[in-house]
Curated annotation (Swiss-Prot):
Family, per entry: Belongs to the protein kinase superfamily. STE Ser/Thr protein kinase family. STE20 subfamily.
Coiled-coil features, chain-numbered ranges: 450-513, 545-650, 752-873
InterPro entries in the cross-refs: Kinase-like_dom_sf, Prot_kinase_dom, Protein_kinase_ATP_BS, Ser/Thr_kinase_AS, TAO_STE20_kinase
Domain of life, per lineage: Eukaryota
CDD domains: STKc_TAO3
Biased composition (Polar residues): 334-348
PROSITE patterns (alphabetical): PROTEIN_KINASE_ATP, PROTEIN_KINASE_DOM, PROTEIN_KINASE_ST
Binding site for ATP: 30-38, 53
Protein's name according to its UniProt entry: Serine/threonine-protein kinase TAO3
Lineage: Eukaryota, Metazoa, Chordata, Craniata, Vertebrata
Cellular component terms (Gene Ontology): cytoplasm
Cell compartment(s), UniProt: Cytoplasm; Cell membrane; Membrane raft; Lipid droplet
UniProt cross-references to Pfam families, sorted A to Z: Pkinase
């Protein structure tokens, strides 16, 4: 990736486009870690002093490294608080990110390294107070630092406490990733993948461990393998302060921070009100501590400068030393250096000989490389480039160059060149480069970083594996959730489809019934008209027959009367005519009455039969309505039964899917735990082999070094023998002179012979004692070395055995906890499935009861309506005078 070019346009605004190598000059390494290196630098544009953190994102895990850089930059951009490091920008150059921040003097762990003793309680309280304020700010914005330790708590010149290194931070709370530094990790972080999530309370635990670190120089379990420390933290009780010199307030604060259960652990705001950080303390406590540390660092660096300058001058005068000379001078120099450091340590509490020796060895190596080049200019440049203001310049050979104006050599052949003098003047005038970290400490960090690369890779690989396992679990959970959502959506669509189909079927049934009713009504109307027409036609026929019968009867009666009158000759014709007319009128009247009566009977018959026909039609319509409602209710019942069968089938399929998904999730979790445990075991075995190799290498070096040590001790015994011989020789001379003076001259020869024999005998005894001392020393040293090495081997075996047992116990606990978690998940699922099935069955029962109730009510309402309709019809018939209509027998069948 070229400078300033970001492939992702969403992240382009995170980085500055300028070339960082042109902007930031005078880079000096001031720290080293797994991410890379931190440099002191000057902004050439603003002349501002900054710290530059270089992070490479090339090589293995390139994408993961790039994402970590993106996350840290985004996190830093959001921070605006006096107790968090100030972010100034980020640049890209040759697959390296330059993260620019404000410059701080050093970290709280540097104080411990420089003074080689714990901090005072008031100093710990001041540092803790500042760190707590930064944590309270983070936690109030749902952020988690996740890597609180003394090395990530920085100090500025005015004594301001700053939280730094947000590479492990999280912008979401709760979180569940396995990140942080092992010895400071909270138990819930170690168990994050196995048991669930954590929140900002993990920073409180790390702060408690940091307090112990500041009070005891190292965090708890620091003498243990980092992996073993993880297992120990996860299953053992919380650590406490070991010494009784601390106040109850401090002890209570630490115990409060290190509550095993997160819910019992206090929040950062609550801790800010604790007496330990709230009580009164001197305002300049941190400023004074920083000043003392700077003075101690300056003294140590000056001592290192004088030591290296002496070596350079000796080599420039005497040339290369042979091996024996180097050994002797190394021994003498080590003795004198130890005396110097002991004296200096009692006054200034600065690092012990071990630290300076490490720096010495690295510096000597680099100087020897310079000497082998044969360039006097390079030698002069090195000897005159030590910075009096504790500035650090990191070369590729790990030499930290200092400029010391007070150590100019008057000899012209050893003075630096003009260019070197100007460079020294440049560093001498740059007084702003103040630090509380010595050059030897930075050198040691670099060497430790190189030497512990295998262990660091193992730990980073373990963290990466845990994070990868977490990602796999989350991916599977998301996949299963999507599958379940899809399944539920499918079931929901099936239910909706069934409901729509049922509604359509009922609507079709309703339409069909409506059409049938309409058709029946039309048929009934047609039948009624046909029935009426039949009655009318019959009545017309009857009326015609009746009229014809009347006509015949009229004629018969008329003829009969005429015959009777014709037989009666006595009656006058006129009277006969009157009688015939009167009889004709009476007959016509009678026939008219009979016709009217017939018409009345026909009309009554017509109306009554029409009424009866309407009643029959109404009863038939009622039967059709009953049939329709029976059909509709049966249809609804069938649909509801089909719906219930579908719901039960869906519940069964959901149950099978849930059990299958839980089985898949638990199987993956167990597979990952087995893989994790296998990796942990392999790491432990690899660590055991490495420790055994290191111990074997150490013993081999001791065996190789033993002849040299024995030679030194033999020389000491030889010197003692020589001194004794000299004393005896002096005593012999004194005794000889005395006896010669007090004895006659004739006895001198005898006395001299006697004294000579005595001297020879005593020297022979001394020689025998010398040989015996040498042999005893040889035997005792060999035996002592064998016993010491055997004791070391035994101690290492015991330690490794304890760590292996601790690992086995931890893995057994994790396995048991996981199995218990799986059992709880299975029980929870069974309860959920059982409860859901019970709710479904209850719902089905309630719906069936509601359906039966609806059926009964609708049939009841139908019968009541039909009865009212018939009753109304019959009442109307009664009012119309049809009281003798045939009563319709209603069906007694109850469809309920």
């Amino acid at each position: 990736m070229r400078r300033g070019l970001v492939k992702d346009p969403d992240n382009a605004d995170l980085f500055c486009k300028e070339d960082p190598e042109r902007i930031f000059v005078d880079l000096h390494e001031i720290g080293h870690g797994s991410f890379g290196a931190v440099y002191f630098a000057t902004n050439s544009t603003t002349n501002e002093i900054v710290a530059v953190k270089k992070m490479s994102y090339s090589g293995k895990q390139m994408n993961e490294k790039w994402q970590d850089i993106i996350k840290e930059v985004k996190f830093l951009q959001q921070l605006k608080h006096p107790n968090t490091i100030e972010y100034k920008g980020c640049y890209l150059k040759d697959h390296t990110a330059w993260l620019v921040m404000e410059y701080c003097l050093g970290s709280a762990s540097d104080l411990l390294e420089v003074h080689k003793k714990p901090l005072q309680e008031v100093e710990i309280a001041a540092i803790t107070h500042g760190a707590l304020q930064g944590l309270a700010y983070l936690h109030s914005h749902n952020m988690i630092h996740r890597d609180i330790k003394a090395g990530n708590i920085l100090l500025t010149e005015p004594g301001q406490v700053k939280l730094a290194d947000f590479g492990s931070a999280s912008k979401s709370s709760p979180a569940n990733s396995f990140v942080g530094t092992p010895y400071w990790m909270a138990p819930e972080v170690i168990l994050a993948m196995d048991e669930g999530q954590y929140d900002g309370k993990i920073d409180i635990w790390s702060l408690g461990i940091t307090c112990i670190e500041l009070a005891e120089r190292k965090p708890p379990l620091f003498n243990m393998n980092a992996m073993s420390a993880l297992y120990h933290i996860a299953q053992n009780e919380s650590p406490t302060l070991q010494s009784n010199e601390w106040t109850d307030s401090f002890k209570g604060f630490v115990d409060y921070c290190l509550q095993k259960l997160p819910q019992e652990r206090p929040a950062s705001l609550e801790l800010l009100r604790h007496d330990f950080v709230w009580r009164e303390r001197p305002a300049r406590v941190l400023i004074d501590l920083i000043q003392r540390t700077k003075d101690a660092v300056r003294e140590l660096d000056n001592l290192q400068y004088r030591k290296m300058k002496k070596i350079l001058f000796q080599e420039s005068r005497n040339g290369p030393l042979n091996e024996s000379q180097e050994d002797d001078e190394d021994s003498e120099h080590g003795t004198s250096l130890t005396r110097k450091m002991d004296s200096l340590g009692s006054n200034h509490s600065i690092p012990s000989t071990s630290v300076s020796t490490g720096s010495q060895s690295s510096s000597v190596n680099s100087i020897q490389e310079v000497m082998e080049d044969g360039s006097p200019d390079l030698i002069m440049s090195f000897s005159c480039s030590f910075d009096s203001t504790s500035s650090l310049v990191h070369k590729k050979d790990h030499a930290f160059i200092r400029d010391e104006a007070d150590h100019r050599d008057p000899r012209p052949e050893l003075r630096p060149t003009q260019s070197v003098q100007s460079q020294a003047l440049h560093y001498r005038t740059r007084e702003r480069f103040a630090t509380i970290k010595s050059a030897s400490l930075v050198t040691r960090q670099i060497h430790e970083h190189e030497q512990e690369n295998e262990l660091r890779e193992q730990m980073s690989g373990y963290k990466r594996m845990r994070r990868q396992h977490q990602k796999q679990l989350i991916a599977l959970e998301n996949k299963l959730k999507a599958e379940m959502d899809e399944h539920r959506l499918k079931l929901q669509k099936e239910v909706e489809t069934h409901a729509n189909n049922a509604s359509i079927e009922l609507e079709k049934l309703s339409k069909r019934q409506f059409v049938g009713m309409d058709k029946e009504a039309k048929v009934a109307a047609a039948d009624e008209r046909r029935f009426q027409q039949q009655i009318i036609a019959q009545q017309k026929k009857d009326l015609t027959s009746f009229l014809e019968s009347q006509k015949k009867q009229y004629k018969i009666c008329k003829e009969k009367i005429k015959e009777e009158l014709n037989e009666d000759h006595s009656t006058p014709k006129k009277e006969k005519q009157e009688r015939i007319s009167k009889h004709k009128e009476n007959l016509q009247h009678t026939q008219a009455e009979e016709e009217a009566q017939l018409l009345s009977q026909q009309r009554l018959y017509y109306e009554k039969n029409c009424r009866l026909f309407k009643r029959k039609i109404m009863i038939k319509r009622h039967e059709v309505e009953q049939q329709h409602i029976r059909e509709e209710l049966n249809k609804k019942r069938t649909q509801k039964e089909m719906e219930h069968a579908m719901l039960i089938r869906q519940d069964e399929s959901t149950r099978e899917l849930e059990y299958r998904q839980l089985q898949m999730l638990q199987k993956l979790r167990m597979d990952l735990i087995r893989l994790q445990h296998q990796t942990e075991l392999e790491n432990q075995l690899e660590y055991n082999k490495r420790r055994e190799r290191e111990l074997h290498r150490k013993h081999v070096m001791e065996l190789r070094q033993q002849p040299k040590n024995l030679k030194v001790m033999e020389m000491q015994i030889k010197k003692q023998f020589q001194d004794t011989c000299k004393v005896q020789t002096k005593q012999y001379k004194a005794l000889k002179n005395h006896q010669l003076e007090v004895s006659p001259k004739c006895e001198h020869k005898t006395i001299l012979k006697s004294l000579k024999d005595e001297q020879t005998r005593k020297l022979a005894i001394l020689a025998e004692q010398y040989e015996q001392s040498i042999n005893e020393m040889m035997a005792s040293q060999a035996l002592r070395l064998d016993e010491a090495q055997e004791a070391e081997c035994q101690a290492l075996r015991q330690q490794l055995q304890q760590e292996m047992e601790l690992l086995n116990a931890y893995q057994s606990k994790i396995k048991m906890q996981t199995e218990a978690q799986h059992e709880r998940e299975l029980q929870k699922l069974e309860q959920r499935v059982s409860l859901r099935r019970a709710h479904l069955e209850q719902k089905i029962e309630e719906e069936l009861v509601a359906l039966q109730k609806e059926r009964s009510e609708r049939i009841k309402h139908l019968f009541e309506r039909q009865e009212r309709e018939i009753e109304t019809f019959d009442m109307e018939s009664l009012r119309m005078g049809f009281g003798n209509l045939v009563t319709l027998e209603y069906p007694k069948e109850d469809y309920r």
